[in-house]
């Protein structure tokens, strides 16, 4: 049975939720098995969901025993839901079935995204058994900037500003597809991003970095080329420009997801990125 987690029950449930979050076979994304995020981070993030009007925390019980916790965000205006804690000890399929039914009743017609480690076979099997498509399979790479020493400045890479945003937009419109963060949304939230471009025409490339204030963990949201073809040296240049900027701003960790089997692996490995594991994303139409 799923029910809203009450504040008085938080301490009783959070220990189990964190224990499960440290097991990729019993948890979802974002993963806490990466050696970066801490128990304190997990507790703080989950507690924050209890206080936010656009987030909920549910507890999954069977026969009066707590078996898991699900926390998620629901963006009402966008009709979009996103799970950020999925810690289930057993009967994962039943928990997901109840969760999807709960969301479908409250937000019919919305989209629900669920991210999972490849190891969480129970969750993946239930979703796939319901015909839910896997929309992304990526390697989760992590870079520790604490020992990073920037080399010489990178030539040919240009930061994006309001003045040259259309250069960036000309690239991003060709690669954005159905992604939420399209040109229009990025432009409206320029303060939340760091953008770089390189090259021109079909060979032009872009890198999009999160820029959430003083957060010591940032993420590369996208790095690609206008014609969709991978080019190792421009890729390395864009990535290096991103690392230089993040080091300057005091960032400690950088996350970068790349397609499983993609050619980026060689450059990432040589630059010192560490592969945390495989990420799989599923999208449920409610």
Regions from the PLM with identified roles:
Residues 1-41, 138, 148-180:
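Short amphipathic alpha-helix that is part of the acyltransferase structural core
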Residues 3, 79-83, 108-115, 218, ...:
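Hydrophobic beta-strand segments of well-ordered beta-sheets in folded domains
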Residues 12-16, 98, 102, 167, ...:
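Alpha-helical elements of Rossmann-like donor-binding domains used by nucleotide-donor carbohydrate transfer enzymes
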Residues 28-94, 98, 203-230:
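Conserved donor-binding loop and adjoining core beta-sheet/short helix segment
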Residues 57-61, 194-200, 256:
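Cytosolic beta-strand hydrophobic patch enriched in CBS
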Residues 80, 182-183:
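Generic helix N-cap/helix-start motif at coil->alpha-helix transitions
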Residues 88-153, 238, 247, 253-286:
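Acyl-donor-binding surface of acyltransferase catalytic domains
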Residues 183-244:
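Glycine/small-residue-rich hydrophobic helix-like segments
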């Amino acid at each position: 049975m799923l029910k809203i987690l009450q504040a008085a029950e938080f301490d009783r449930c959070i220990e189990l939720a964190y224990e499960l979050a440290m097991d990729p076979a019993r948890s979802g994304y974002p993963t806490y098995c990466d050696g970066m995020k801490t128990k304190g981070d997990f507790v703080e993030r989950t507690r924050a969901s209890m206080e936010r009007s656009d987030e909920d925390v549910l507890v999954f019980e069977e026969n009066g025993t707590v078996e898991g916790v699900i926390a998620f965000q629901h963006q009402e205006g966008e009709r979009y839901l996103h799970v950020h804690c999925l810690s289930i000890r057993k009967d994962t399929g039943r928990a997901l079935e109840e969760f999807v039914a709960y969301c479908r009743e409250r937000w019919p017609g919305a989209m629900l995204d669920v991210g999972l480690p490849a190891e969480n076979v129970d969750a993946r099997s239930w979703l796939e058994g319901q015909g839910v498509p896997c929309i992304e399979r990526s390697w989760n790479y992590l870079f520790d900037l604490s020992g990073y020493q920037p080399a010489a400045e990178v030539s040919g890479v240009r930061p994006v500003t309001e003045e040259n945003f259309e250069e960036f937009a000309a690239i991003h419109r060709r690669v954005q597809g159905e992604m939420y963060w399209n040109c229009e949304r990025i432009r409206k939230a320029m303060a939340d991003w760091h953008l770089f471009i390189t090259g021109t025409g079909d060979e032009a490339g872009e890198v999009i970095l999160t820029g959430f204030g003083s957060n010591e963990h940032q993420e590369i949201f996208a790095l690609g080329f206008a014609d969709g073809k991978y080019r190792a040296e421009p890729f390395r240049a864009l990535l290096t420009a991103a690392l230089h900027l993040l080091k300057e701003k005091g960032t400690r960790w950088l996350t970068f997801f790349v397609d499983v089997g993609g050619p980026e692996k060689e450059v990432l490995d040589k630059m010192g990125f560490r592969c945390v594991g495989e990420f799989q994303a599923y999208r449920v139409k409610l």
